[in-house]
A protein has these predicted regions:
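Short amphipathic alpha-helix
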Residues: 24-35
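Charged helix-capping and loop-helix junction motifs
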Residues: 129-133
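Short catalytic/ligand-binding loop motif for oxyanion handling, primarily in non-cytosolic enzymes
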Residues: 21, 51-54, 124-127
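A conserved catalytic-core segment of Leloir-type glycosyltransferases
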Residues: 7-8, 34-115
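Nucleotide-activated donor-dependent transferases that construct or modify glycoconjugates
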Residues: 4-21, 115-122
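Surface-exposed cleft-lining segments at the edges of enzyme active sites
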Residues: 89-91, 120-123
Length: 133
């Protein structure tokens, strides 16, 4: 509930993965417990299937372990060898960003979110297209 009101919120949390034993996944589980104890609904969105069934909507384009995401990571931080030139890299990045943006927008809309919490996607440079989307 919002302090002093009876309003329940629909809260979304996004990360590359959820339901795992890494620090971010564990913190997301803690946050969910707190939010739910206050009467809110919590929705998880992740790129990799969770280790346990926790109601996470899986968006494969959000996974950082796929070859497309790894190639974008290399192109952003190391070399354009996977693409040949900057134009091809930019086109691949734009396609990935558009796909993720569409997928995330559909999830946000279908979950009727009031609040969106983005976990580490902007602070960990594993999936540049996810950071842009």
């Amino acid at each position: 509930m919002i302090s002093g009101s009876n309003t329940s919120l629909s809260i979304g949390m996004i990360h590359f993965k959820a339901g795992d034993t890494d620090g971010v996944s564990l913190e997301m589980d803690k946050w969910r417990e707190v939010f739910q104890s206050q009467g809110h609904t919590v929705h998880f969105c992740c790129g990799n299937p969770p280790m346990h069934a926790d109601g996470c909507t899986v968006l494969p384009a959000l996974a950082y372990v796929g070859e497309d995401a790894r190639a974008l990571n290399r192109g952003t931080f190391e070399t354009l060898d996977d693409y040949g030139d900057a134009t091809a890299y930019s086109q691949a990045m734009n396609v990935a960003v558009l796909q993720l943006t569409e997928d995330l927008h559909a999830w946000i809309t279908s979950s009727s979110l009031d609040v969106l919490i983005i976990e580490n996607i902007w602070s960990v440079g594993l999936h540049p297209a996810a950071a842009v989307a």
